[in-house]
């Protein structure tokens, strides 16, 4: 039941509040206080759940209560009166991104310095906490609620977007220390499995105004979001097609320098090989994200990665490095390599 009497103004259904309180709206409304409490701390504050739970608490009867947004909701004497607004967005503004706890709220203050990362086009923001960032191609707009950082450089303001490794396999690979991503400014990238365009938007930042990203996504629902991202970013070309049939979009895509693939499909090796035959320059590169459970959920992840690498070699995709994406994703690996390398003299 949770502590029934805990909600200061609890009244009536307060009991249910404790238990039902996790959903914020707390049983019988009385849960306001208790609800706020459950909502607030319940799921570790921050993030999506905490915040929302709290607000629900507000509706449930704690009046403006839960508004404490995950903060201390119910504690504030009047079911949150004190909480009201507290931290606004979920526990103290943490949890920007919802999934994966977001960027953890980039705490920079005034002393943020931007350093170039060894991958061209990627940067590191150094502040109270360090973050991986890319230079915003469309200053003033965000794509998925990520944090933005403005830095003045010789009188001109440059805006950077925090790149969250829990939302992006490529960011996870970069933070995991991948040797090469093969996407320098000005390069052309074919991105298979673009989804809603979260990572695509960062690749668009990295390759910059001279580069191009061909973003292929089969799902119409994600495709809608992708097209909205592409409306603002002139260097993204959205293609709502099945990556298994590259001939369907051959008239849209020129030769590319790099293929990035994040298609969680059992035959993704074949999908990449087909697209490479159509669009990848000889000596061009590929970066493939492999989710072990999507290919064979019964085998050990390591065995799955090894067999995928064997298949690639058979398709003239020559892997050069492989790394796992721990601690950001479980049972994922990224394989980077070269396509039809020129014969050694």
Curated annotation (Swiss-Prot):
GO terms for biological process: box C/D sno(s)RNA 3'-end processing. Component of box C/D small nucleolar ribonucleoprotein (snoRNP) particles. It is associated with the U3, U8 and U13 small nuclear RNAs. Residues 8-108 have a biased composition (Gly residues). This is rRNA 2'-O-methyltransferase fibrillarin. By homology to other fibrillarins, some or all of the N-terminal domain arginines are modified to asymmetric dimethylarginine (DMA). S-adenosyl-L-methionine binds at residues 198-199, 217-218, 242-243, 262-265. GO terms for molecular function: histone H2AQ104 methyltransferase activity; RNA binding; rRNA methyltransferase activity. It comes from Drosophila erecta (Fruit fly). Its main location: nucleus.
């Amino acid at each position: 039941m949770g502590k029934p009497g805990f909600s200061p103004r609890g009244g009536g259904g307060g009991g249910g509040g404790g238990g039902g309180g996790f959903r914020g709206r707390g049983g019988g409304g009385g849960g306001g206080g208790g609800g706020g409490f459950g909502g607030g701390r319940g799921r570790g504050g921050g993030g999506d759940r905490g915040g929302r739970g709290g607000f629900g608490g507000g509706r449930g009867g704690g009046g403006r209560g839960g508004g404490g947004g995950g903060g201390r909701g119910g504690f504030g004497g009047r079911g949150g009166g004190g909480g009201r607004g507290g931290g606004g967005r979920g526990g103290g503004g943490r949890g920007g991104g919802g999934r994966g706890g977001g960027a953890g709220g980039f705490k920079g203050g005034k002393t943020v310095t931007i350093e170039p990362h060894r991958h061209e086009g990627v940067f590191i923001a150094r502040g109270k906490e360090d973050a991986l960032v890319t230079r915003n191609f469309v200053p003033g707009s965000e794509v998925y609620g990520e944090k933005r950082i403005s830095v003045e450089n010789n009188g001109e303001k440059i805006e950077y977007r925090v790149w969250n490794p829990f939302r992006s396999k490529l960011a996870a690979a970069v933070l995991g220390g991948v040797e090469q991503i093969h996407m320098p400014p000005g390069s052309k990238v074919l991105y298979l499995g673009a989804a809603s365009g979260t990572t695509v938007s960062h690749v668009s930042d990295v390759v910059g105004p001279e580069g191009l990203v061909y973003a292929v996504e089969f799902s119409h629902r994600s495709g809608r979001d992708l097209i909205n991202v592409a409306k603002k970013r002139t260097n993204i070309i959205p293609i709502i097609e099945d990556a298994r049939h590259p001939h369907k979009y051959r008239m849209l895509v020129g030769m590319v320098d790099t293929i990035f693939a994040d298609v969680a499909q059992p035959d993704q090796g074949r999908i990449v090989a087909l697209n490479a035959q159509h669009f990848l320059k000889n000596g061009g590169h590929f970066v493939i994200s492999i989710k072990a459970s999507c290919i064979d959920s019964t085998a050990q992840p390591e065995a799955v990665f090894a067999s995928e690498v064997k298949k690639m070699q058979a398709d003239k995709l020559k892997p050069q490095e492989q790394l796992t994406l721990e601690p950001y994703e479980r049972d994922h690996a990224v394989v980077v390599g070269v396509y039809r390398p020129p014969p050694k003299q």
